[in-house]
Amino acid sequence: MSILFYVMFLPYLCGIHATNMDKRNLPENSMNSLFIKLIQADLLKNKISKQTVDTKENHQSTIPKPQILLDLDGDDNMKQDFQPVISLEAELVKQQKQRRYKSPRVLLSDSLPLEPPPLYLMDDYIGHSTVVNNRTSRRKRFAEHKGHRGEYSVCDSESLWVTDKMNAIDIRGHQVTVLGEIKTGNSPVKQYFYETRCKEARPVKNGCRGIDDKHWNSQCKTSQTYVRALTSENNKMVGWRWIRIDTSCVCALSRKIGRS
């Protein structure tokens, strides 16, 4: 734009200075020299401005852009099957305040549990505590079991706290690693699982107790259900997942061939 202005202004400037040059006997190329100097000054100014802009753009391009974090909670399937954990210590405090999805069969504690969860009976519990064989304890156990006299279970089961669970199958069918010892604060915390399983497949000779063996084949089988636990997959992606654990003993029946 400046060069165009100089080109348009040149004839006017030449007309004004023509008379003066005649009177003062100025050299003929004085106007050309003036015009060339003005153009050079303008070009130099534009070049400096352009270099300044390029320098700013290059500096901005070298600044690293912030990494985009993926929102795992945005995917509904991922949110249901896997919930990532950033800080284990903060997550433990959060679990103490929130009881949603919390199963009594999963315990996070710094010491070995000596009793079953409050919601489960102690009839079939085989814990690590010693039993004191005295008259008071026998009377207490008799009073607790008094209401169960005359009742029999089709299958015999046993329940215990599993303290060394290392692997499990999650709700997607993938094998995951169960976090054993979790380092937080002063003392480490471990995960304990209260599991129930069958003592034996056939409590009686022909299968389950109380089943008509003339018409039915029966067998006691351990059943599983899903609980939430802190796990990792391929030594990464630590978070809460639904995993299968043993929770009951049921009697499986099948009709004998040739029987109606």
Curated annotation (Swiss-Prot):
The GO terms describing molecular function are: growth factor activity; nerve growth factor receptor binding
**Chief location category:** secreted
Where does it live in the cell?
A: Secreted
Query: Where is the secretion signal located?
Result: 1-18
Biological processes annotated in GO: cell surface receptor protein tyrosine kinase signaling pathway; modulation of chemical synaptic transmission; negative regulation of neuron apoptotic process; nerve development; nerve growth factor signaling pathway; neuron projection morphogenesis
| InterPro entries in UniProt | Cystine-knot_cytokine (IPR029034), Nerve_growth_factor-like (IPR020408), Nerve_growth_factor-rel (IPR002072), Nerve_growth_factor_CS (IPR019846), Neurotrophin-3 (IPR015578), NTF3_N (IPR045815)
The record's section on PANTHER family has: NERVE GROWTH FACTOR NGF -RELATED (PTHR11589), NEUROTROPHIN-3 (PTHR11589:SF4)
**Where does this protein have coiled-coil stretches?**
none
Q: Could you tell me which species this protein originates from?
A: Xenopus laevis
Q: Where are the transmembrane segments?
A: none
- Specify whether Cytoplasm is a keyword of the entry: no
Q: What does this protein do?
A: Seems to promote the survival of visceral and proprioceptive sensory neurons.
Instruction: State the protein's name.
Output: Neurotrophin-3
Entry keywords, A to Z: Cleavage on pair of basic residues, Disulfide bond, Glycoprotein, Growth factor, Secreted, Signal
Q: Which GO terms describe its cellular component?
A: axon; dendrite; extracellular space; synaptic vesicle
| Sugar attachment sites | 134
Q: Which cysteines are joined by disulfide bonds?
A: 155-220, 198-249, 208-251
Q: What is stated as this protein's family in its record?
A: Belongs to the NGF-beta family.
Propeptide ranges are 19-141
